[in-house]
Amino acid sequence: MIPKFLKKRIFKAPVATDHTASTPEFEAEMLPVASTLYANAPINQLYRKLSGQLLDVAVKPKLLGELPEFDDDDNILRFYVLQDYSRSNSILIDLQTQEHNLPPALVGVQDITHDVKENAAIIFLHHPHAKDSQLSPRLSRLVAAVLQHPELQVRLVPVSILWGRAPEKEDSLFKLLTADNWEDPSITKQLFNIGVMGRDTFVQFHPPQDLRTLIHDSLKGDGEGFSVFDSVASETNTVQNTAQADTANDANKVNDIAPSFAMVASADGNRELVRSLQQQLNIYLDKQRASMLGPDLSDRRNLVDKLVYSPAIKHAIEAEAAASGTSVREARMLAKGYANEMVNDYSHSIVRGFYKFLTWLWTQLYDGVEVHHFERVRELAADYELIYVPCHRSHVDYLLLSYVIYMRGLSIPYVAAGDNLDVPVLGPLLRGAVAFYIRRSFRGNALYTAVLREYMHTLITRNTPIEYFIEGGRSRSGRLLPPKMGMLAMTVHSQLRRTNKPVVFIPTYIGYERIMEGGTYVGELKGKPKESESLIGLLKVGRKIERIFGNVHLSFGTPLHLSDFMQKFDVPANSLPADRTDTPLDDKTSAMVDNIGVKVMQHINKAAVITPVSLLSLVLLSAPKAALDEDICREQIALYQGLAQHLPYSDDTIITDMTPQQIIDYGIKLKLIERIPHILGDIIQVAGKQAALLSYFRNNILHVFILLSFLSALVARNGRIERSRLNSIAEQLYPFLQSELFLYYSAHGLTETLNKKVDSLLASGLIVELSDGMLSVPETNSKCYQQLQVLATPVEQSLERYFMTLALLAQQGSGNLTENEVVDLCHLLGQRLSVLYADDIPDFFDRALFTSFIGALIRLDYLQKDEETGILIFDQRIDDIAHHAKYVLSPDMMQILQQVASLNEEEIAHAITEISNKNQRKFGRKRS
C-alpha cells in the first residue's frame, strides 16, 4: 500500500488572483532574489529526495542538444516550462538540473522586491488539479508581476522530455504504452515509462525565452500565433481604466517604457494574455517534439494501398494501361509492386539496435566523429520540411549522417538508397531503419516515376525529413560529381502541389581521413567493373574494422530555402494540380531546379573541412616523387594553413587546428606517409602505393586552393607577368575550373576575387610586385620560390586534361565525334598518360571530369551538339582556349599531351568498338 504522503503533489498551485502579502520572515531576507526550499514542507522534501533516488536508479536519461546559456545576473528569475503535469517529469528535470549545474527546478524562487514567491521553478502548461485547467497559475502570476514591475526579468526555459523516441503508429491499440504521446500521462503510463522506457529517455533544454519580450511581441501581434492577441489591448485597457489610482500610475510608467503594454495588476485580469502565451509555448513545444519524434507512422501495407489508390496514381495506372494495352488491374498490380520495392518499413526497434551497434562501430573505426554547424539544422527543424543533401563519399554515409542526426535529438530522415543495397539481410535492416529504395535508372518508365513522385509527396506532406545524395552515386575521385536533378525535381514538384511546411535544403559535407572503399575506387576509375553489393562484400568490409581510419567530419552548410529560389525565378506557389504527378515543370521551374542543384554543390564545398590528411595529401602530391624534406614539409603545411586562414574560402570552412608537426605525426600514425631517416635531414614521403588513395583526400579540398594554385602557376611558369594579363587569362579559363570544382565565385566579380588572392600571395612573399605593375617570382634560390613551385602544381593536372581534350578535338576535326565518344576516348588517353607519365594518379582518367569539361564547353557555346546525332561541332575558338595552356604548362608537357592525343582513324574505330561492346555487356540486362 502506498503511503498517503507519497500521493501528495510536488507543489500546491494556488490560483489566487492577488499575491499574498510577504511575511515578515521573508521581508527580513537580505537578498531580493533567493532560491530556497520552504521550511514548512519537510514531507515534500522527503518525498522528492526519496523519489529522486528511486528515479535515478530506474531512469538514465540522455541529454539532447546544448545546455541553456544563462546570464550571470542573479536578479533574473528562471523557470522551466513543461507541457504536462507529471511527478516523474518534475523530479527528472530536477535531477538533470542538479547533474548539469543548472538553476534547480524543485527549489523555491523568491523575489521580495517584486512580490514573487514560488515554491518551485517549474511551470506546467497543463495541470489537472488547477481551478482552470486551461491556464497555468504560476505563469499567470509571473505575467502579472512582469507587467507590474518594468525592471523584473524572467526567463522561461522550455523543456522536452521523451519517454522513448518511437514515432506513433496510426491505429495502434498499444500506442499509449509503446511510445511518447501527446496526452497527459496517467499514473499507469508514468509507471510504464519509468519501468520500460527509463533507459530510452531523452531530455532537451531549449533556449531561454525572455517573458517580457514574449508579452511585448504578443501585444504587438508579431510572429506566428500572435494574431490571438488582437483583442487583448481593448480588454486590458478596460481593466486599466477601472483600476485604483496607484495602479494606473504604475501602468503609465510601464507604458513610458513599453507603450504596447497594457498594465494589469491582477492575475485574473490577464486571462486572455496568459492563455495566448500558454498557447504559444504549447505550439513551440509541440513543434520541438515533432522534430524529434517525426510524424505518426502508417502501417507499410496501408501506406502502399493508399499510394496505389490515390487519385494521382489512379490516373497514372489508367494511362499505363492505355499505353501498354494491359488491363487496369494488371497496371495496378505493377504499380503496387513498384510501391513495395521502394516504401520504407520503419521499425524503432531496428533504429535503436542500429544506434547501439553504430555507437560501438564508430569507436572501433574512428578516433572521433566531429560535427560542425549542427545548430543551423536544429533551428529549422520545427518549422521546415528538412531535405538533407549530403555529398556521397562512402556507403558509410547512409548510416553516419542518420546516426549524427538521431544522436542530437532530431527525427531520423528517410534516406533514398539505390536498390543495389537491397540485398539479403542488409536490405531489410536498412529498410526498417532509414532507407527507401529507388532504382538506379528508370528513365522512360512513366508508372514507376509516378509512384516514386507520389511517395515523395506523401513523405513531404507528412513532414518527414528526407535525405538523398544529389550526386547520384559515390564519388570515386574525391571531387563532387555533377548533380543529378531527378530527386531535386521531385521535391520541387511536391512543393508546388501544396505541402504543409516550406522546404529547406541542408547541404552537408562529409569528410573522411581514410575510406574503406579506397582501393576499389582506384580500380573502378581504371576501368575495373564495379563490384555489386552483397553480404559477402559487407563481411569483407567488416574485416577492416581493426584498421585505423582517423576522424570523420560532418559539416552542415548554409541552408537553402526553396521559397527564395521560387521568388528569384518567379515560380508561383501551388502552381501544380494536387491530384496529378505527370504535370511537367515549365522552363522557368526547370531552370530553377538546375540552379538549386549547382548551389547545393557550392554550399557543400563551402562547408568543407580542411583535415590533416587532406593538407598532407595536397602538399606531398605536389612535390617531385611525392616526397619532401621534413622541415620543408612543415613549412609548406604552415603556409597552406596560413593562406586558408588569412583569406578563408568561406565562413563555413573549417581548418584543422593541429600544428604542422602534429599533422605529419598524425599521417604517420594512419600509415599514409612515412619518415625516411637521413643524416642531412629526415624525408617525409607517401607510404607504399598510397599516392592514388591520397589523391582522393587532396581532391576533397582542392577547390579551396585552386585559384591560388592557378595564379601561382601563371607567375611561376612565366617568371614575370602583368597583373592585367594574369587576370585576363584567369577569367578565360575560370569557367572550366568552376564547373569542375563547383567554385562559388561569380564571374562578374571575379576580378575582385583574383586581386584578393594575388594580395594574399604577395603578403606571403610567394610572389613579388615590381614597380611597373609586373608580378614576378621571388629569388630562385629562396624558400618562397620553392614553396611557390609546390603551390603551383595542383592546378596543372586539370589544365593538362583540358589541353589533351582540346588537342583530340582539334586533331579529329569538327563534326566527327559525339560527346560520348570524346569522353570515352579521353578516358582511355588519360589511363595511358597516367601510367606513362603521372605515377598512375587517377585524376587523369576520371570520366566525370571529362564529362564536366565537355559540358562546360557546350554551355559556354564553344561546342555545339547536334540534337539528333550527338555530333560535336566547333570552330577555331577551341584553338584559342588551348593557346592559353602555354602560360601554365611546360612545352615538354604540351608536346607529350599532343602526342598522346594523336590517334588515327583505325585506332579510334577500334577503341569505340571495344567501348561499345563493353557497355553492352555491362548494361545488356534491363529491368522492366
PLM region spans:
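Membrane-interfacial terminal anchoring regions of lipid-handling membrane enzymes
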Residues: 1-467, 472-928
